Amino acid sequence: VHQETIMSVIIQVDRAQIGKKTIAEWLRRRDADLATRALAAKADVRLLDLTAPLPDTDRIEILTFDDEAGREVYRHSASHVMADAVKRLFPDAKLAIGPAIEEGFYYDFDLSHNFVPEDLERIEAEMRRIIAEDLSFQREEIERDVAVEFFKQRGEDYKVELLGDIADDRVSLYRDGEFVDLCRGPHLPSAGRIGAFKLLSVAGAYWRGDEHRPMLQRIYGTSFPTQEQLDEFLRLREQAALRDHRRLGKELDL
């Protein structure tokens, strides 16, 4: 299921406002309609949260769900909400990685319990609660060594390993409520911006793709601003799966 890439909106910056307002505050005054659709921003090559101060730049690119970078931010935030829900329901789960991918997102977990379809329904219900709470995504930049100690205390071994590969002295974390993750960002202003979502499947995945490392459980999902968009995606996905099934049947002469 392919989604067309549309150019995002570029706006000239009033230099008198630089550093005095957040990007979201500035945008609400410039274009109230666009502000309701904005997910994040880009200045030069930097991706920024809407809660960041208006940067020192001449032009700023506003990312919405209509462009690829905006969809990535949207779905990355959805992956954090899913991971938050999993940690609430399964506190022993260890967090690995959870990126946005072309048509959705996934998150890898290390957990002795094997996820079953009923678990996905429970996780979805918890995600709906988190979205209803409208928890804000808060960026925090700290010393790398402090982050290592923080995640060690939480028993998050995979995050500690990832931090060992980061050369920078400072790293960024994102919080929503009690949930904290190591992440470059950016993210949506809050979880309440996520409109519709669906957890699609569970698969096994070796940590870092190495068969000698632990086998993790990967939950795949997708998210859209509206239920109509999600329903259309699921309909097209089902049609594609049916075509593949029929083609395979012909190839195997079934």
Indicate where each model-derived feature is located.
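Short acidic beta-strand-loop surface patches of small beta-rich interaction domains
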Residues: 38-52
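Short strand-turn-strand beta-turns centered on an Asx-Gly dipeptide
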Residues: 12-15, 42-45, 110
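Short amphipathic, charge-patterned alpha-helical segments
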Residues: 19-33
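Short, basic/aromatic beta-hairpin or loop at an interaction surface
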Residues: 31-41, 80
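Short, Lys/Arg-enriched N-terminal segments with co-localized hydrophobic residues
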Residues: 1-6
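Short, contiguous acidic and Ser/Thr-rich linear segments
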Residues: 10-22
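Short amphipathic alpha-helical face segments that pack within enzyme cores
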Residues: 22-26, 77-85
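Auxiliary tRNA-acceptor-end handling modules of aminoacyl-tRNA synthetases
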Residues: 37, 52-73, 82-85, 94-98, ...
